[in-house]
């Protein structure tokens, strides 16, 4: 399934997916309308930072979108949340949020995101993140 989706996105068939190919795909699917969010997700998937997503990088990412409705208005935020949730426990810690945004050179965003912790328990659930981000 991941391989078939990769091939669908890789329009020129060169074995790597460029940002433009991803942008065209999500536009066709009417998913992730915010370009800054799409760029952040792309950079997060592109682990080696070469400006393209190879099949291995895509396979690692595929789990975060598997079973998701790509036309869901919140799909970009849900994917971003899963990319930040490094340990996969379904809640974000301050360390996960800070590490993610620091890696992308926008650590000030981490402070804002931590405000999503509505109940003050030190973790951000997906629900809190979506509510805060809307």
Curated annotation (Swiss-Prot):
Residues 1-32, 33-68, 72-107, 108-134 form the EF-hand domain. Ca(2+) 4 binds at residues 117, 119, 121, 123, 128. Ca(2+) 2 binds at residues 46, 48, 50, 52, 57. The keyword Oxidoreductase does not apply. GO terms for cellular component: cytoplasm; phagocytic cup; pseudopodium. One of its GO terms (biological process) is positive regulation of macropinocytosis. Disruption phenotype: RNAi-mediated knockdown causes a severe reduction in fluid-phase endocytosis and phagocytosis. Also, recruitment of actin to phagocytic cups is impaired. Ca(2+) 1 binds at residues 10, 12, 14, 16, 21. This is Calcium-binding protein 1. It comes from Entamoeba histolytica (strain ATCC 30459 / HM-1:IMSS / ABRM). The lineage of its organism: Eukaryota, Amoebozoa, Evosea, Archamoebae, Mastigamoebida.
């Amino acid at each position: 399934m991941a391989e078939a989706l990769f091939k669908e996105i890789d329009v020129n068939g060169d074995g790597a997916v460029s940002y433009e190919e991803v942008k065209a795909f999500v536009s066709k699917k009417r998913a992730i309308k915010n370009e800054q969010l799409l760029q952040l997700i792309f950079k997060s998937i592109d682990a080696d930072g070469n400006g393209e997503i190879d099949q291995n990088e895509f396979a690692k990412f595929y789990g975060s979108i598997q079973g998701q409705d790509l036309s869901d208005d919140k799909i970009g935020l849900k994917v971003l949340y899963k990319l930040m949730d490094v340990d996969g426990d379904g809640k974000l810690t301050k360390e996960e949020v800070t590490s993610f945004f620091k890696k992308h050179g926008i650590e000030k965003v981490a402070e804002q995101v931590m405000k999503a912790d509505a109940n003050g328990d030190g973790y951000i659930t997906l629900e809190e993140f979506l509510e805060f981000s809307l």
